[in-house]
């Protein structure tokens, strides 16, 4: 009888001990897969994103500094030539440079930069809204820094219009997250080298992003994204493109031949399906 009582007591004791031990040991949270966004802020990921961003920004600055800002410096000035804040919105040569197609280029480039920042921040555990907002702010800051550097360049100048275009592009992903209509709209870029006019002039094989004569920017619309319940194929969109032709002469004001054809050139428009 004592043996039976002892066995029952042991089973009860082990059961109680196991229950108490399970209650005191916290559950181990499954590790988030590397390529999956963290649910909460992951300090290690956040630090890695910051370190990678700083390295990328430094590398980009080093490249652009040699490509764009290697000339002798001037005092700070706006694109219109003046240095007073009241002259910030004066139209300079920037107003006719590349038939203003570069404004779309600033928008598109900033949108890509902002999206990269936002994806990294989201991966580290921030919410979607926080990530897109921070992406917009950081993208705008990068655009502002570029324009400030341009403000000291003898070739360029701080362009308020370039900065505004870049800022809109930086916040476009955030605006898309808030608008059903904007989710169906996107900006895309294509490059096809159909002539060498630009490269024949600059005498080097670089800076293709400034070769607007061979560049096309597309505004795409996908009806399925606007109304998922529609029968419109989700892989098919409609695109309207814009570019400039090879008559776009004298990219820079100091080009041989003077300024008589500065700002000339014709637009090219395209209509095409957008197959995703």
Language-model region placement:
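Residues that define the transmembrane beta-barrel architecture of outer-membrane proteins
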Residues: 211-217, 263-271
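Residues on the lipid-exposed face of transmembrane beta-strands in outer-membrane beta-barrel proteins
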Residues: 171-175, 217-223, 271-275
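N-terminal targeting leaders of membrane proteins
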Residues: 13-103, 107-114, 118, 122-126, ...
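Short loop/turn motifs that connect adjacent beta-strands in outer-membrane beta-barrel proteins
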Residues: 39-45, 122-134, 175-185, 224-236
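Transmembrane beta-strands of outer-membrane beta-barrel proteins
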Residues: 138, 142, 185-187, 234-240, ...
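Transmembrane beta-strands of outer-membrane beta-barrel pores
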Residues: 191-195, 242-248
